[in-house]
Amino acid sequence: RRQRQMCIRDSEYMTTILSEYTEANNNMVELVICNNDGMAEGAITALKTAGYNASADKAIPVFGVDATDAAKELIAAGSMVGSIKQDAEGMAAAIALLAKNATSGAALMDGTDSYNVDDASAKIRIPYAVYTG
């Protein structure tokens, strides 16, 4: 039976998870998805300490979010599979447009036709980019 667990903070948490979910218990961690690259680094440390990810036959893929320089190095080294990169330039452009509209008296969403706009909640969704090296 597959279960989901949240990787909350660091390598200590991942070490605990790896001690509870083992091959011996027939309930092994198969994939680690972290909410940021710092958590992914901690997970990678814990996995390596437990003897994982040193070879392809005993590998558990790890993913993070932010595409930090450290994560890019881990991806290049083969220790991490990928990360999600936020589009800072796209976010800044959207914020600048909305600020301009708000200060000029224009309708807030004027000029947003090229964006992915959720009309039900007046949100502009800026796409993320997958980083795998």
Q: Model regions: which residues?
A:
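Hinge/cleft segment of the Venus flytrap/periplasmic-binding protein
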Residues: G90-G133
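Short beta-strand elements at the ligand-binding edges of bilobed clamshell
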Residues: A77-E89
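Short, well-structured alpha-helical segments in soluble
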Residues: E12-M28
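Short, small-residue-biased leader/transition segments that mark boundaries at the very start
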Residues: Q3-I8
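Residue-level recognition of the N-termini of beta-strands and the immediately preceding loop/turn
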Residues: R1-R2, N27-L31, K58-P61
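Venus flytrap/periplasmic-binding-protein-like
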Residues: C34-N36, E41-M80
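Short, solvent-exposed amphipathic alpha-helices that sit
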Residues: R1-R2, Y13, I17, G42-A46
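Extracellular/periplasmic ligand-binding modules, especially the Venus flytrap/periplasmic-binding
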Residues: L31, N35-I44, A88-T103
